[in-house]
Amino acid sequence: MAEISLRDVRKSYAGIEVIHGVDLEIADGEFVVIVGPSGCGKSTLLRMVAGLEEITAGEIAIGGRVVNRLEPRERDIAMVFQNYALYPHMTVRENMAYGLRIAKLSKAEIEERVARSARMLELGQLLDRKPRQLSGGQRQRVAMGRALVRNPAAFLLDEPLSNLDAKLRVQMRLQIKELQRTVRTTSIYVTHDQVEAMTLADRLVVMNAGVAEQIATPAEIYDRPATTFVAGFIGSPAMNMLPARGLGDALEVAGQRLAVPAPAGRDLILGVRPEHLHAAGPEEPGFELHVQAVEWLGADAFAHGRLADGTDLVLRTPGKAPVRERDRLKVAPDAAALHLFDAETGKRL
């Protein structure tokens, strides 16, 4: 195991910078998830750590050793890819042992490592099968087993669950979490799926257009997003964003005055998560929501509607709550769960 350090890491293609000075310190044994939309630079950043992409500027160190000029095989890392990358003509046992044979480990050591990893990943009954005889989830476990047997300093996982169906993704998430709890190997995991990110990570790196917008624990990112991008990306449905105007001792939002101190004369964004809206009392300041659609999910329902000024709003309600399309509701935000952002910069106040 080892710590991983990225210092002002940059990447350019044809003179155009696509990764803009990322700084990240990953502790020994920590599980860090890099999350963001397609094209944000998360896989490029992972590939630079792996040595599959050259860095344009900055420094990457693994276990205190600068690896900028080292080949992937010299970095003591193991990668797990989205497409499994298994040898189709080899059995599960042979796939898992292949890298160890190349490293010229003894037969006894290879057998012991394969057997131990197979037990961890519940692959014992599959060791003599070929990849074509396995399900998608089983293939991904074999790919993880092949990485695990190497006892690397770090695991790098690039969207490993993307090819699996929803049920298998849940199963594999739980297995990855249990595996990390057992082996405590330093890991960087890339995904666009916020559920994977929130459930697996010790810390998250939220990427946007080559910039690490926020690096924090899942709870901190959900409760105190640093920017409107982070607030809108993490959480489903996304946080409601309401144009607002600071009045000093209050906030003007959608024609209503809320008793929320805010810089006078400043254009702001008020962020409210769907679960932090409630039915307003008769004397309570609130917004009239014209419900246009209701998504019923069983335990919960999401009412999608529009305010008088045309702003879209989503309200989370209990699944049994009698909210219907075309209803008009008076709703108010929970005062303790408001988020204020600068309208120009998008940064949290």
Swiss-Prot record:
KW Nucleotide-binding (keyword) present: yes
Signal peptide per UniProt: none
EC number(s) recorded for this UniProt protein: 7.6.2.10
Domain of life: Bacteria
Gene Ontology BP terms: carbohydrate transport; glycerophosphodiester transmembrane transport
GO molecular function, one term: ATP binding
Membrane disposition: Peripheral membrane protein
SUPFAM superfamilies: MOP-like, P-loop containing nucleoside triphosphate hydrolases
Key words, A-Z: ATP-binding, Cell inner membrane, Cell membrane, Membrane, Nucleotide-binding, Sugar transport, Translocase, Transport
Compartment(s) where it occurs, according to its Swiss-Prot or TrEMBL record: Cell inner membrane
Record-linked Pfam families: ABC_tran, TOBE_2
Primary site of residence: membrane
Residue intervals of the ABC transporter domain: 4-234
Catalytic activity reported: sn-glycerol 3-phosphate(out) + ATP + H2O = sn-glycerol 3-phosphate(in) + ADP + phosphate + H(+)
GO cellular component: ATP-binding cassette (ABC) transporter complex, substrate-binding subunit-containing
Binding, ATP: 36-43
Family: Belongs to the ABC transporter superfamily. sn-glycerol-3-phosphate importer (TC 3.A.1.1.3) family.
UniProt function note: Part of the ABC transporter complex UgpBAEC involved in sn-glycerol-3-phosphate (G3P) import. Responsible for energy coupling to the transport system.
Subunit structure of this chain's protein: The complex is composed of two ATP-binding proteins (UgpC), two transmembrane proteins (UgpA and UgpE) and a solute-binding protein (UgpB).
Entry protein name: sn-glycerol-3-phosphate import ATP-binding protein UgpC
Organism, as annotated: Cereibacter sphaeroides (strain ATCC 17029 / ATH 2.4.9) (Rhodobacter sphaeroides)
